[in-house]
Amino acid sequence: VTGLVIGLINAGIIAAIANVAQGVQVMLIFLAVVIAVLGVASIFLIPDFKGEIDKNAKLFSLKEAVEAIKHPGVIWACVAYFCVYAVYQGATYTTPYLTQCFNADGNLVNVVGLIRTYGIGLIAGPVVGWLATKLKSPSKVILGAFILSIAVLLGFIVFPHDPGAAMVAATLVVVFGFTTYGAFSIGSSPLSEIKIPMRIFGTAAGVLSVVGFMPDVFIHTWYGGLIDAQGIDAYTSIFGFEIMFGVIGCVCLVMLLRTIKKHFGAESVDKAEEAEAAEIAGGEATI
């Protein structure tokens, strides 16, 4: 909500001031004041939690990391999350796509960009989370989001770049924002489906984060280079690569669902939970 409100205020400032450079200056001053106020407020509002940092806590264990990676389904979940994040980051380029390919009005592009980045999250996250709970399978919901995202990406590629069709393209951008944000909001949830023991769950989540957020290392440099070299023709390439990531993500999720069915069916889950309960009970008895 905060991002949407601040973003709309920024867009309003830019739209209200005729000189773009002055508008940006005023916007930056506004943001600086907001950050300064929040910084001062945090000193008084954020409590000091005693013992928040445990100096005796066990450090990173390579053995646990290897065990987490070897756990059935973890690799598929990690690569799927990598693809989810890659497609999610690719949605950033739908804003310049509207500007450069459709010559869309700047204010329209700003509003659509804000809705895609912030506003859609108010709906997509809860809706997709509800679906995942209803179906009892985040992986299936993410798979569906991938399929819808691929369909929209194909629409971006084949849609004629007619300025009169800017509103239709903007609608596709919002739909794409919904599917990508929705998938991203539950992107790490498949870990809960593969019944990772709690003693290594944190390590597995860390591995997922390292692999999943890796697109940040290269994707913007890559796509930016394509735009510099090819101009508006680059968007066909960018959306093509986004489709590639989506297809790879679908394959990984299908393999993950097969792994879940093979290793973590109802009977297997019961046995795993019984074994873990026995292990915990044995540890408590020893203590």
Across the structure, where does each feature detected by a protein language model lie?
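Glycine-rich segments within core transmembrane alpha-helices of 12-TM secondary carriers
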Residues: V1-A15, S209-I219
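C-terminal transmembrane helical hairpin of 12-TM major facilitator-type secondary transporters
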Residues: P138-P190
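Extracytoplasmic gate region of multi-pass secondary transporters
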Residues: P72-P126, F184, S189, I219-H220
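A late C-terminal transmembrane helix in Major Facilitator Superfamily
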Residues: K195-G231
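Juxtamembrane intracellular "pre-TM" segments in multi-pass secondary transporters
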Residues: F49-C78, E274-A277
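C-terminal membrane-cytosol helix-exit motif in multi-pass small-molecule transporters
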Residues: A32-I53, C252-L257
